[in-house]
From Swiss-Prot:
Location in or out of the cell: Cytoplasm
Active-site residue list: H54
Annotated gene: fabZ
Record-linked CDD domains: FabZ (cd01288)
Record keywords, A-Z: Cytoplasm, Lipid A biosynthesis, Lipid biosynthesis, Lipid metabolism, Lyase
Catalytic activity as recorded in UniProt: a (3R)-hydroxyacyl-[ACP] = a (2E)-enoyl-[ACP] + H2O
GO terms for MF: (3R)-hydroxyacyl-[acyl-carrier-protein] dehydratase activity
Protein name: 3-hydroxyacyl-[acyl-carrier-protein] dehydratase FabZ
UniProt record similarity statement: Belongs to the thioester dehydratase family. FabZ subfamily.
Amino acid sequence: MSNQMNTMDIKEILKYLPHRYPFLLIDRVLDYTPGVSLQAIKNVSINEPFFQGHFPIQPVMPGVLILEAMAQATGLLAFKTMSSDVPPPGVLYYFAGIDNARFRRVVEPGDQIHFDVKMIKERRGIGVFYGEAKVDGEVVCSAEIMCARREISQ
């Protein structure tokens, strides 16, 4: 059994996710096991565009963007489960639903968010995942996320 880590740098992430600045919220994948789990990070900088209005005096990363980043990590795991090489042309994973989202503390500039997403099940192109976002080992957000695989015209 190999202890080799499966990682993804930003160049590879860009091949899988359609998101671009300012909405690409995953900086690196630290490890993944197709069909099982994926760990990724987001470095939170004061230069993030959302900090201009949320909130100028006490900058806090919006919770919906923490969930969006978690959903992007989920999409990467779904793609890597489907095909470990390159993403198939004309296929996207859409955010289909969320349950039991909980926020436990704020995320501020200078934090590094570690995402850990686990695949619970997949059936007929609908995947169900559980994710946690942590800063310094402390859970800041957790949720069950659903995504749907769809063919798109190119």
